[in-house]
Amino acid sequence: MVSLLRCPSSKPYSSLICSLTLGAVVALSGVAYAEETKPAETVPVVTPPKVISQPATKNQVRFTKTGAFDSDTVVKIAKRLAAKPYVALKDPLPAGLAKLSYDEYRDIRFNPTASIWRDQGVPFQMQMFHRGFYFQDLIEIAIVEGQNATHLAYEPKYFTAGEVITQALPNDDIGYSGFRIHNQLNTNGVFDELMVFQGASYFRALGKGNAYGLSSRGLALKTADAEGEEFPIFRAFWVERPYNDSNLIVVHALLDSPSVAGAYTFSVRPGDNTLIDVEATLFPRVELSKVGLAPSTSMFLHSLNGRHDTDDFRPEVHDSDGLLMLNGRGEHLWRPLANPRQLQVSAFSDNSPQGFGLIQRERDYASYQDLEAHYERRPSLWIEPVGNWGQGSVVLTEIPTESEIHDNIVSYWKPRQPIPAGSEFHFAYRMSWGDEPAAKVGAVHVSRSASGRADIAKATPRRLFVVDYQIEGPMTDEMPVAKVEASGGVVTNVVIARNAAKNGYRLAFELEPEDKELIELRAELKFPTPRQVETWLYRWTL
């Protein structure tokens, strides 16, 4: 079984994600971590960092050496890297840092007064993460100004040590484990977290008013594979100094793993929906047949749809509640997520997809009742391919979980043809972090799905499904005709009715599974006057 473990998202101070596969830790670096930020104008009492009297082993700068930089610099480095056999870089930490507990690691905090570009009139600030605990890998960072890059060396002055931390901070350049970008996203004069890069190739971002939820990665390799998943890592970053009057920050990243090296550029524009344009070039060392482009990772524990064996005071618990797709034929598809009893992998074949993404559609606090986690504020993530991505599939992986601390949902685009070894593969896409992209939603779209036992008076294998559709705009006198299809079992009692509470319609039907353990369901509404209507998809399992 594959699972993605993280610290409870209900903790207000942090969220921790570690990647586990087949019951064993395959990439301790596969972690994303973010701690609570403070307003820019707040100047904390700074505890001077303890400094190791005996220097730690000095690590050599491999990628971010100070010197000339242009748009092809990282591509050239990735190409040279891929031409050689993969080398697992070993950059040892002083023993004390390598063995930090979670509480000790969390007590090493970046000093906000040392933020990069602070007091320079720049609309962004940057703070780095310390190495230690699960975050053993050394990540190099450079700051780019004009045509020059300057290596950002580790210095203990960037960090403060609280009372819990008993280990001294080193005085040598041990690098970092990642960084986060701050912006006046929500309030003028207050620099809130906007985006985090930390752990393998994980990153995540926020739209206005959001709280951290799902994550993305640079690349997915061998997801849910019996041999174990491979986790590429961003080994180095080059962050361009933003212009003082700009709403854009650009980050370049070098990706590496046993199978592939690559160069990425992230152009980030914060807003109600934060937009990130991604340009990537891959240089495979081996043929990539089990590759996922634009992968997203999320959590779904329970909702009104699916299993009802969770003893929880909260009606719903999830970072995302559905996979939205706009395929190459212009069809809008909505697939509610599930927490299955067994690992499930679904592939939605397509040609030149227009978009897909894990969406948090339910935005009502009453649906979650969680005063700490506030799942209603978790961002949706919409992926819009740039150019023709050709034939392939949107892949959805749903992993059983008994707790919200596990990220158990993965989605990505899988090209139909493998990417050959020794080739140079380019792709690009736009990410939208925030509310659901309204322009990509059908004029008649699914607002809610629920299911339960068809006969509440006695036990029965028959299932009742209820799908609510909402109309954008005023209701009309037209009544649609419902078409429900199932890959097995028998569908009965299909009923469509007006639903004034949702300014739309309610579709209800029953499913008799018979002897089936897995059934694919598809529901469509047909109007006398053609309309853009979402197609509802669902995989029922025992």
From Swiss-Prot:
Subcellular location: Periplasm
SUPFAM superfamilies, per database record: E set domains (SSF81296), Galactose mutarotase-like (SSF74650)
Pathway linked to the protein: Glycan metabolism; osmoregulated periplasmic glucan (OPG) biosynthesis
Signal peptide from the UniProt entry: 1-34
Highest rank taxon of the organism: Bacteria
UniProtKB keywords: Periplasm, Signal
A molecular-function term among this protein's GO annotations: carbohydrate binding
UniProt keyword Kinase, yes or no: no
A Pfam family per the record: MdoG
Gene Ontology cellular component annotations, sorted alphabetically: outer membrane-bounded periplasmic space
Example GO BP: beta-glucan biosynthetic process
Main location per the UniProt record: periplasm
Similarity field: Belongs to the OpgD/OpgG family.
Biological function: Involved in the biosynthesis of osmoregulated periplasmic glucans (OPGs).
Protein name in the entry: Glucans biosynthesis protein G
Species for this entry: Shewanella baltica (strain OS155 / ATCC BAA-1091)
